[in-house]
């Protein structure tokens, strides 16, 4: 692999607003998404905003997953960044969109830490 990692930036639309505003459901979805990628979960931090919305991060050995929700718009901004080639960030992004009952998603993959020669990092 010539890149240290893959970072998926997803725009998730038409989601179930009740799910987007439920901090416990969002946390569970994000942790399960990390597991779906094959990652090792290290820590989680989630916050419920007033009057609505949730933001959170799942720190994984391979990097992180984040989400920021706007229930009033049925929208979530999702990032899944994984390092190494034993995990697949697309598995996590697709799982999240499915669990949010999204009608539409656009996503972009960014290669992170791109080097001219293949790189090998300890623990990956």
UniProtKB/Swiss-Prot annotation:
Cofactor(s) this protein cannot do without: pyruvate
Record lineage: Bacteria, Bacillati, Bacillota, Clostridia, Thermoanaerobacterales
Positions of the catalytic residues: 63 (schiff-base intermediate with substrate), 68 (proton acceptor), 83 (proton donor)
Gene Ontology molecular-function annotations: adenosylmethionine decarboxylase activity
Cofactor, how bound (note): Binds 1 pyruvoyl group covalently per subunit.
Residue positions, PTM Pyruvic acid (Ser): 63
Job of this protein: Catalyzes the decarboxylation of S-adenosylmethionine to S-adenosylmethioninamine (dcAdoMet), the propylamine donor required for the synthesis of the polyamines spermine and spermidine from the diamine putrescine.
Gene Ontology, cellular component aspect: cytosol
Functional pathway: Amine and polyamine biosynthesis; S-adenosylmethioninamine biosynthesis; S-adenosylmethioninamine from S-adenosyl-L-methionine: step 1/1
NCBIfam families referenced in this protein's UniProt entry, alphabetically: SAM_DCase_Bsu (TIGR03330)
Catalytic activity: S-adenosyl-L-methionine + H(+) = S-adenosyl 3-(methylsulfanyl)propylamine + CO2
EC code(s) of this entry: 4.1.1.50
Name under which the protein is recorded: S-adenosylmethionine decarboxylase proenzyme
UniProt similarity note: Belongs to the prokaryotic AdoMetDC family. Type 1 subfamily.
A biological process term (GO) from this entry: spermidine biosynthetic process
Marked site (Cleavage (non-hydrolytic)) residue numbers: 62-63
Keyword S-adenosyl-L-methionine: yes
Alphabetic keyword roster: Autocatalytic cleavage, Decarboxylase, Lyase, Polyamine biosynthesis, Pyruvate, S-adenosyl-L-methionine, Schiff base, Spermidine biosynthesis, Zymogen
Superkingdom of the source species: Bacteria
């Amino acid at each position: 692999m010539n890149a240290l990692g893959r970072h998926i930036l997803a725009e998730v639309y038409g989601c179930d607003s009740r799910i987007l505003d439920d901090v416990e459901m969002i946390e569970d979805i994000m942790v399960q998404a990390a597991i779906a990628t094959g990652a090792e979960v290290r820590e989680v931090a989630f916050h419920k905003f007033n009057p609505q919305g949730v933001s959170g991060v799942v720190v994984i050995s391979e990097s992180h997953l984040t989400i920021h929700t706007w229930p009033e718009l049925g929208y979530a901004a999702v990032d899944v960044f994984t390092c190494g080639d034993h995990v697949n960030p697309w598995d996590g992004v697709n799982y999240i969109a499915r669990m949010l009952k999204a009608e539409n998603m656009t996503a972009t993959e960014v290669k992170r830490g791109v080097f001219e020669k293949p790189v090998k990092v300890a623990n990956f």
